[in-house]
């Protein structure tokens, strides 16, 4: 579905395209299979009349209870473009303002986290009742695991048989015959288990159909529990709506992946969301015409005076650069963080110094804004995300080039430095996308040297503190902490810090040792802060590299073909049958550094923006020769050889070439 603007009775109205009717066809058949939401809308056209040209079904909802369905020729439909702008914020100026209740804004973040956890509890209880209603699906899950295990064993035996055939240069010998017999038995076993699994799934579907009314009532109970949870959350509607949207998206993904929603530990992070009814122009935002949000532009010097921080300085090299074109302002947003004596919503404002590294989009309508608070180490980083809509595209509509490519995702350390994360083949040339070595070195330092120093300090501090607190004269409250430390399976800097802070209440007890404990705590804290900030910076650099790469690819190619690979299986330490995953320790580290799921996500977003088509296919792209379609076998590392034509090729280039041929 996409948002569009149409003209009705001479006035422009925004709506959502929910379907398309081809020329010389009617909408009657489409309406028969339409969703409940579409069927409940009032139809403003004759569904039995054939359209002369391809038209779009547009749903208009002027109120929450009214829905109208229009049939509009495509040439009269004007797409609405969504623009998202993210800017950095300095710390709020009135976070602990005496004019407002103490800790009210912080409490609002806590309530949002609590609402999320309440929704997770509701979802888990709903899943448990659903499983109880339709019967246990453990048998089906066990069979799926058994099928996956048999397939893995078949794959291992088949690979061994191929190697023996190459080694003996014939298809028959005692060793190969033994493998053939084992493969035959496994295939027979797989067929029997698959047949039984099919019967089990059919029986489960019958149980679901039989329990249709009960399942419907169970879903109604879940929805009622969700409504009760957000009504009793104590949150303003804009903020509980943001939590609900996150819950709906996470729930759909969890149901699709067979996963479970997880509770969130509250660490002070969160967001404040203002949804602007009817929208607001950029001019209204700058002039402060609406109390929901305002942005007052100031000079860099004034920003420094207000925030108490030194204003950013510019040198001659910055003149004419993007940094030179920055603007500064004070962003004020309205929050409802509680109720007064008359049980009315209590309104307050939060003000932030903001750095506008890029201009706000002209002529756009502001629909919502979110202020985010994220913990990084012991500090918090603030940012604001504006969501605008406009009828004018914000980027040049590129003409079709007809270019296509196959893109194979993976990771491989390059001899010249860097980590290969993808290989592109477009029919004439093959090239690699390489993550810069500077990012790899930084991640190695953070996750290796720095993390190791923190772990060593935690172990040393743990043993040292237990030695200092070994006497019987230890105060009673500290004895409880000592017991907690002794029970800990793994020393942690936070546990040591908690114990040292509690020690401050007893300055007379081992004063010299207490001073040393403070020094140890501060040293560990410095390392922890350094690690958190360096990791955050490196992850931002990697994301920026992937975004730029995705933008370049989608500006050149009309169609990009990817392998439909399940990245979750690569993250598992064990297979379904309990056997270890094939990835080595080094390969696992490189997988985390590459984070190819982020590259795939960036490609998806850039393709949607630039009009590039992403095709995902399931094919044995690495094991099939791109030249003759013969079977490939590994020779040395990344190099594979075809058994038929004896071509020696890079595995990634061969896979990218096979993907390219899928979209020819």
Swiss-Prot record:
RuvC-I: annotated span: 405-618
Protein name: CRISPR-associated DNA-binding protein Cas12m
Binding sites annotated in the UniProt record for Mg(2+): 652
Binding site for Zn(2+): 625, 628, 642, 645
Residue ranges of the region described as Target nucleic-acid binding (TNB): 618-650
Record-stated family: Belongs to the CRISPR-associated DNA-binding protein Cas12m family.
Region listing for Recognition domain (REC2), in residue ranges: 138-212
Keywords: Antiviral defense, DNA-binding, Magnesium, Metal-binding, Plasmid, RNA-binding, Transcription, Transcription regulation, Zinc
Additional note from the record: Part of a type V-M CRISPR-Cas system.
Region (Linker): 391-404
Record text on cofactor binding: Binds only 1 Mg(2+) as opposed to 2 usually seen in other Cas12 enzymes; lack of the second Mg(2+) results in loss of target DNA cleavage activity.
Source organism: Pelobacter propionicus (strain DSM 2379 / NBRC 103807 / OttBd1)
Listed GO biological process terms: defense response to virus
Organism superkingdom: Bacteria
Record has DNA-binding as a keyword: yes
Region (RuvC-II): 651-664
């Amino acid at each position: 579905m996409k948002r569009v603007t149409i003209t009705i009775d001479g006035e422009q109205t925004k709506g959502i395209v929910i379907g398309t009717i081809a020329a010389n066809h009617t909408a009657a058949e489409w309406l028969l299979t339409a969703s409940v939401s579409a069927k409940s809308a009032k139809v403003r056209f004759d569904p039995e009349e054939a359209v002369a040209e391809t038209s779009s079904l547009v749903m208009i909802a002027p109120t929450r209870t009214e829905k109208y369905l229009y049939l509009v020729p495509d040439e009269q439909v004007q797409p609405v473009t969504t623009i998202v702008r993210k800017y950095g914020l300095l710390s709020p100026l009135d976070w602990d303002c005496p004019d407002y209740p103490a800790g009210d804004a912080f409490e609002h973040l806590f309530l949002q986290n609590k609402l999320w956890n309440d929704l997770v509890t509701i979802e888990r209880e709903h899943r448990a009742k659903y499983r109880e209603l339709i019967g246990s699906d453990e048998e089906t899950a066990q069979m799926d695991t058994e099928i996956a295990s048999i397939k893995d064993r078949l794959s291992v035996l088949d690979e061994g048989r191929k190697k023996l055939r190459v080694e003996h240069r014939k298809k028959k010998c005692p060793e190969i015959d033994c493998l053939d017999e084992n493969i035959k038995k496994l295939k027979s076993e797989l067929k029997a288990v698959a047949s039984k699994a099919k019967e089990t799934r059919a029986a489960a579907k019958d149980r679901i159909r039989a329990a249709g009314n009960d399942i419907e009532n169970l879903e109604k109970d879940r929805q009622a529990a969700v409504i009760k949870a957000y009504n009793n959350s104590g949150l303003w509607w804009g903020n509980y709506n943001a939590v609900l949207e996150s819950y709906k998206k996470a729930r759909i993904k969890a149901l699709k992946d067979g996963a479970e929603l997880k509770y969130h530990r509250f660490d002070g992070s969160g967001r404040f969301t203002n949804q602007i009814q009817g929208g607001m122009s950029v001019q209204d935002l700058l002039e402060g015409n609406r109390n929901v949000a305002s942005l007052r532009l100031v000079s860099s010097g004034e920003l420094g005076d207000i925030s108490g921080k030194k204003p950013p300085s510019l040198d001659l090299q910055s003149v004419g650069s993007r940094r030179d074109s920055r603007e500064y302002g004070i962003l004020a947003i309205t929050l409802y963080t509680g109720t007064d004596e008359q049980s009315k919503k209590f309104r307050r404002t939060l003000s932030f110094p903001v750095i506008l590294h890029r201009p706000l989009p002209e002529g756009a309508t502001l629909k919502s804004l979110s202020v985010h608070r994220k913990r990084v180490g012991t500090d918090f980083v603030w940012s604001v995300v504006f969501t605008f809509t406009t009828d004018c595209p914000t980027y040049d509509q590129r003409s079709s080039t007809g270019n296509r490519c196959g893109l194979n995702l993976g990771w491989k350390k390059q001899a010249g430095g860097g980590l290969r994360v993808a290989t592109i083949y477009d029919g004439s040339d093959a090239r690699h996308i390489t993550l810069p070595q500077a990012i790899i070195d930084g991640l190695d330092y953070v996750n290796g040297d720095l993390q190791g120093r923190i772990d060593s300090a935690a172990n040393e501090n743990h043993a040292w503190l237990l030695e200092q607190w070994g006497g019987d004269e230890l105060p009673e409250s500290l004895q409880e902490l000592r017991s907690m430390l002794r029970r800990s399976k793994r020393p942690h800097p936070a546990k040591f810090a908690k114990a040292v802070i509690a020690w401050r209440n007893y300055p007379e007890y081992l004063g010299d040792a207490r001073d040393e404990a403070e020094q140890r705590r501060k040293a560990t804290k410095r390392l922890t802060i350094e690690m958190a900030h360096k990791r955050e910076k490196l992850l931002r650099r990697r994301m920026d590299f992937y975004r730029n790469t995705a933008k370049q690819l989608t500006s050149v190619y009309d169609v990009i073909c990817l392998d439909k690979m399940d990245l979750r299986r690569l993250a598992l330490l064990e297979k379904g049958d309990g056997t270890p995953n094939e990835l080595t320790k080094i390969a696992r580290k490189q997988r985390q550094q590459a984070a190819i799921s982020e590259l795939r996500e960036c490609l998806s977003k850039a393709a949607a923006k630039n009009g590039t088509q992403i095709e995902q296919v399931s094919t044995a792209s690495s094991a099939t020769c791109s030249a003759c379609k013969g079977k490939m076998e590994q020779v040395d590392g990344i190099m594979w050889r075809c058994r038929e034509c004896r071509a020696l090729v890079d595995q990634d280039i061969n896979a990218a070439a096979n993907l390219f041929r899928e979209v020819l």
